[in-house]
């Protein structure tokens, strides 16, 4: 099994920062590679021949410079730095069609930005469904004065994996009628899973030991994390899944949740943790179990009927005498027990000393999430508009006043839902497509109510983890059924709501968030499930338009569509 030694990682980090001072710089070549993520050969999108991509390790205040070389033969690429607010550098956010053009094959684009706040983050492709192809890695920003006390740490990057290519998946989702891509074949921890092995890569369903086909040095073999007894370890967890909602447990150990999406939270103890796509956590694990044993870290599916085996990693005490854990891994909680999931979400509060939200908001959006049809194509819509991101990036269109590049009519801020039954399929299944924006003045307080509803057929409402670019927001609360304006606001938590950049919208319910428009730019706000975003489930926020018009934006970020023509006519190359 692959072994990670925490103290070695720490030495590397210290040496890196000693040599690099306040600049973390690297050149990344993105290309397809043959790989065995789940013991079955497939094609991954690798960085410098590595899958998952290299970990960025920086200190708050550092400048990160990444030169991305596109070595893909026939497609563009961008990279989004998930959780980094990009204050003053919206062009470096890495959202194709929103903040930049795709990097063409053979070309290089340089991302340069400051990591202004410590936390556990990650990066991933944000063009088409490239995240699902393995274009992702961890991004750790350390605090010069860490408030947590622990002896070592490990990164756990969680993902899901299909044997079908992303191009086939995109075609299936865009077909008429839509062809659903199905559940992932495997779950991965740090790029490793076991598709052709029995449960736990060691046990069959009856609990009897079984033999797997992989060897100890295979790319799919479970990693081993070596620990010493009676120590405290920080597990940095990030979910970059394309579809799956997950649950993580460590056999024989409890977890203390201390960080969520790069923000400290009031510590609380759990036996396992739900992790939705786009979320990150830090948990503290005390190694107080029998040191002669080995223990499983297991990751299973939540929120969808599980048809995918667990992903596994091994906790190995240095004095352990076992060759492998002698017991089956923890059983993932029942997939459709949403009350259990909601109970976990409602335990998350801001740590002491964190800023409280403003008492009142200046504006409110109520975003109704529905599944609809557009000319018989299945789409996801927000307030009856399925987002169609234009070829010309919004940031360039707004910076240079190119008003023909996107729809000037903004989507509805609220739909009249008095007679809309969220518990049933939509009475009118048809929707529209659009590229309009929500335009906010600089420095105002905005509330967003995410409202879930039934899908096109049956009695089903899906989980949607929503992620915002360029911001953190306060999670004010969750509710059942249809949001009641003027009434449900009274239930908002204004005392100690957590700051997040990703929040879950539960089936047949609503979620309320609040943020301040203090970061001039164009920011994506979307469901973090790849198929849902591909099918139109997102909106675009623009704030501080007058300030965007004064920004110095690199021409290379905007060299496509109408901005390309505008820049050429200005006499620039």
UniProtKB/Swiss-Prot annotation:
Pathway: Cofactor degradation; L-ascorbate degradation. Keywords: Copper, Disulfide bond, Glycoprotein, Metal-binding, Oxidoreductase, Plant defense, Repeat, Secreted, Signal. Cu cation 3 binds at residues 126, 469, 526. GO terms for molecular function: copper ion binding; L-ascorbate oxidase activity. Binds 4 Cu cations per monomer. Disulfide bonds join 39-220, 101-560, 197-212. The keyword Oxidoreductase applies. This is L-ascorbate oxidase. It comes from Arabidopsis thaliana. The gene is AAO.
């Amino acid at each position: 099994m692959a072994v990670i030694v925490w103290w070695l990682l720490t030495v590397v980090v210290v040496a890196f920062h000693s040599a690099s001072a306040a600049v973390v710089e690297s050149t990344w070549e993105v290309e397809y590679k043959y790989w065995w993520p789940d013991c079955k050969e497939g094609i991954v999108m690798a960085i410098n021949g590595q899958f998952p991509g290299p970990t960025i390790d920086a200190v708050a205040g550092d400048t990160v410079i990444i030169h991305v070389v596109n070595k893909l033969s026939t497609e563009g690429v961008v990279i989004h730095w998930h959780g980094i607010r990009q204050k003053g550098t919206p062009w470096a956010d890495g959202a194709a069609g929103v903040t930049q053009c795709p990097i063409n094959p053979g070309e290089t684009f340089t991302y340069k930005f400051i990591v202004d706040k410590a936390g556990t983050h990650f990066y991933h492709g944000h063009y088409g469904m490239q995240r699902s192809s393995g274009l992702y890695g961890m991004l750790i920003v350390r605090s010069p004065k860490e408030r947590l006390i622990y002896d070592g740490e490990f990164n756990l990057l969680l993902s899901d994996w299909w044997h079908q290519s992303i191009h086939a998946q995109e075609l299936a989702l865009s077909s008429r009628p839509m062809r659903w891509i199905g559940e992932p074949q495997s779950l991965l921890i740090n790029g490793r899973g076991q598709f052709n092995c029995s449960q736990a890569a060691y046990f069959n369903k009856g609990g009897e030991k079984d033999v797997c086909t992989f060897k100890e040095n295979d790319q799919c073999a479970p990693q081993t994390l070596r620990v010493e007894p009676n120590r405290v370890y920080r597990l940095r967890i990030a979910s970059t899944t394309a579809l799956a909602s997950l649950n993580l447990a460590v056999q024989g150990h409890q977890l203390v949740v201390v960080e969520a999406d790069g923000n400290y939270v009031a510590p609380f103890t759990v036996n396992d943790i739900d992790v939705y796509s786009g979320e990150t956590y830090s948990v503290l694990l005390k190694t107080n179990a029998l040191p002669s044993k080995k223990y499983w870290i297991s990751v299973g599916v939540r929120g969808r009927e599980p048809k995918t085996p667990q992903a596994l990693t091994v906790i190995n005490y240095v004095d352990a005498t076992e060759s492998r854990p002698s017991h089956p891994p923890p059983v993932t909680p029942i997939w459709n027990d949403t009350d259990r999931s909601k109970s976990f979400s409602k335990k998350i509060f801001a740590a002491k000393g964190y800023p409280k939200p403003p008492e009142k908001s200046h504006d409110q959006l109520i975003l109704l999430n529905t599944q609809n049809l557009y000319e018989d194509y299945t789409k996801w819509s927000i307030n009856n508009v399925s987002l169609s991101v234009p070829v010309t990036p919004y940031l360039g269109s707004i910076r240079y006043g190119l008003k023909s590049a996107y729809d000037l009519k903004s989507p509805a801020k609220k739909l009249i839902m008095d007679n809309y039954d969220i518990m049933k399929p939509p009475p009118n299944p048809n929707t529209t497509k659009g590229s309009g924006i929500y335009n906010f003045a600089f420095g105002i307080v905005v509330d967003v109510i995410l409202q879930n509803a039934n899908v096109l057929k049956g009695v089903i409402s899906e989980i949607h983890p929503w992620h915002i670019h360029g911001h953190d927001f306060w999670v004010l609360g969750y509710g059942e059924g249809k949001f009641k304006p003027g009434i449900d606001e009274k239930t908002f938590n204004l005392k100690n709501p957590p700051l997040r950049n990703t929040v879950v919208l539960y089936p047949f319910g609503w979620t309320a968030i609040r943020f301040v428009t203090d970061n001039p730019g164009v920011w994506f706000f979307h469901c973090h499930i790849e198929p849902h975003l591909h099918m139109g489930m997102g909106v675009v926020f623009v704030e501080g338009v007058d300030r965007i018009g004064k920004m110095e934006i690199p021409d290379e970020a905007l060299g496509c569509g109408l901005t390309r023509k505008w820049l050429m006519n200005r006499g620039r190359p």
